[in-house]
């Protein structure tokens, strides 16, 4: 289905929990987070019902997010149920802390691949950024994801000035030997009262300039309409992706909606607009009723975000862990 600006919307990102087993400095509020009660979260049946309805309008791609999605107790059966709806491309974003234990089970259930969030290669720094995480668990998860066939493994890196921007070259260098997709994502305002400051953002052109010191960067495009500009260093096995929501927004070909953990469709990540589907579902709404809400959410999708405008309408009103990253 196309929106008001002729963009084909065929991708849904679903947050299945707001809980997380890490407390990353750029994601969690400085004062902590009050989690949703279990009854406030969409059930498996509600999630699958919504996907089946959206499939009628050309939905083909689903990404499961959180919080940390692997904290959901029945994640394996949920993955299986989503895949059974006929979704062609099913992926999941995780911090990798517990992935190694169930990577094979996730693949068998129908998961196609994973993105693993990792902002440093140094154990001590990882513990600081995540407030206690063990990087060795993530390293093992990357290996297990490869063994299970959840490939290509994509590693999401958020360069933050004064925290980890000195590791950009180390991450990029991983692609010489490994078939990883290393994706550098500009630091965005992800929570209220967090560490986000515009001066901390390392813009994508600076990232590319640093990486180019390692060798010639060749443009490498994939089929699809994702936000990543992709490159390969000459002679490298893997890919480098650049995602620039601030310095070079990709709104003109955005193809996605988000479904929050508490059952609200979010047409744009950085908008106050939300369409509640949970309440109607729990009040005997028909599939036709939910279908109309889905179509409405596409029609009200804005032309672009206004992050750089610093207006009241774009100030963060939920943490990224509740919206789904």
Predicted region positions:
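Short, small-residue-rich loop/turn micro-motifs
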Residues: 18-20, 28-31, 118-120, 186, ...
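Radical SAM/AdoMet-radical enzyme domain recognition
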Residues: 41-64, 68-185
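Glycine-centered loop/turn positions within well-structured domains
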Residues: 22, 123-124, 249, 275
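Residues that scaffold the ATP/ADP-binding catalytic core of kinase and kinase-like folds
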Residues: 23, 27, 124, 129, ...
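Conserved, mostly hydrophobic/aromatic
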Residues: 16, 64, 263
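Canonical Radical SAM [4Fe-4S] cluster-binding loop centered on the CxxxCxxC motif
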Residues: 4-44
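Auxiliary Fe-S-binding modules of radical SAM enzymes
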Residues: 1-11, 177, 187-325
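A short acidic, helix-capping loop that chelates divalent metal ions and anchors anionic groups
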Residues: 32-37, 122-129, 191-195, 276-278
